[in-house]
């Protein structure tokens, strides 16, 4: 296989043919045109593809999404891109009843510090993308929790995570990991960086009690200890509204698997509910939604934690979303999104007494 593209100019018809041919023998790509680019933690670009009809490519769509590291932060975020490539090659084919975009190709190259996935274009499949600005109804939030319960149950306390197991490559959830993996996470706690974030609209929109960098760091260090306690399962880790879509039947699906981890179920559940539901609705619904999730877990054969134990774990996890949406670089999320979601987590952290729980 030739080198992975690291610029849009390197996404060529010969490269695309070579990428897709193993699963579509005899494929011939006549031409491609680079379309819309969508920037974030990773970069997605839409390809308009013309195939040779004689090559039997009628089953392939004329538009595809190529996702990978095409920005200045490619090397810093390589591990996340690699995780998504491995998700599509190793985990997506095994998922039980969880909707994700169809993956047509996934490959990573450590020497290049680049990873690429080629995905179906959901815009052509009748999908509707969820948006931070459009909060969920109770029924929509419950449907998302059903999806998370299915994901969590499939690898609940799985032996596959053990050293030497097929999923040993998946890191444990850690808000402030050591070493190279924590380069980005810990850099956001540098006093100058944190102060700069607090001066942005997201910081102005939340209570000044969250401007205390030292207190935030202590809370994250305590959350690291909390996260080491099982039971552990496979996590998406980033199930905010912008990473969900609805298929043409209105059923939820999950995007952006570049942060897949093993860790406590409460992380995903809290992150989903707090980021996706209006603040006042969250106050009214969250205990019922938590009970709904626990019931869904049980329906998949998992013995769920007791409600009060689950309620404590859920409230502790508010700290993670609060920290990351307060310090999220604008290169990854536009400020209107950072401001909206950070405010939801800040409101929840006060309601939940999260800093006190993580003292």
Question: Where are each of the predicted segments found?
Answer:
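ATP-dependent phospho-/nucleotidyl transfer catalytic cores
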Residues: 126-236, 248, 342-359
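Active-site activation/catalytic loop segments of kinase-like enzymes and analogous catalytic loops
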Residues: 86, 90, 259-262, 266-302, ...
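Pre-DFG segment of protein kinase catalytic domains
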Residues: 254-256
């Amino acid at each position: 296989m030739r080198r992975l593209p690291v610029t849009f100019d390197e996404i060529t018809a010969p490269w695309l043919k070579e990428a897709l041919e193993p699963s579509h023998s005899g494929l011939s790509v006549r031409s491609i045109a680079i379309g819309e680019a969508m920037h974030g933690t990773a970069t997605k670009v839409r390809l308009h593809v013309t195939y040779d009809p004689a090559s039997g490519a009628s089953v392939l769509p004329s538009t595809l999404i190529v996702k990978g590291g095409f920005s200045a932060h490619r090397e810093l975020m390589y591990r996340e891109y690699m995780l998504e490539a491995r998700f599509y090659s190793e985990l997506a084919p095994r998922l039980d009843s969880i909707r994700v975009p169809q993956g047509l190709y996934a490959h990573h190259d450590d020497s290049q510090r680049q990873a690429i996935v080629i995905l179906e274009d959901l815009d052509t499949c009748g999908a509707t993308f969820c948006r931070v600005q459009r909060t969920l109804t109770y029924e929509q939030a419950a449907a998302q929790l059903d999806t998370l319960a299915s994901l969590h149950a499939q690898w609940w306390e799985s032996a596959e995570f053990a050293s030497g197991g097929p999923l040993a490559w998946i890191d444990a959830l850690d808000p402030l990991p050591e070493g190279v993996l924590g380069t980005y996470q810990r850099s956001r706690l540098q006093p100058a960086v944190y102060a700069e974030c607090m001066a942005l609209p997201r910081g102005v929109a939340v209570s000044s009690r969250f401007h205390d960098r030292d207190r935030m760091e202590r809370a994250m260090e305590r959350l690291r200890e909390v996260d080491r306690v099982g039971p552990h399962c496979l996590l998406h880790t980033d199930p905010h509204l912008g990473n969900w879509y609805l298929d043409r039947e209105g059923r939820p699906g999950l995007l952006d698997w570049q942060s897949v981890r093993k860790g406590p179920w409460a992380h995903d559940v809290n992150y989903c509910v707090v980021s996706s539901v209006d603040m006042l609705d969250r106050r009214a619904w969250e205990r019922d939604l938590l009970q709904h999730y626990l019931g869904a877990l049980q329906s998949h054969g998992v013995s769920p934690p007791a409600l009060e134990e689950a309620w404590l774990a859920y409230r502790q996890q508010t700290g993670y979303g609060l920290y990351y949406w307060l310090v999220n670089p604008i290169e990854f999320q536009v400020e209107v999104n950072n401001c909206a979601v950070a405010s939801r987590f800040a409101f929840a952290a006060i309601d939940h007494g999260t800093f006190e729980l993580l003292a």
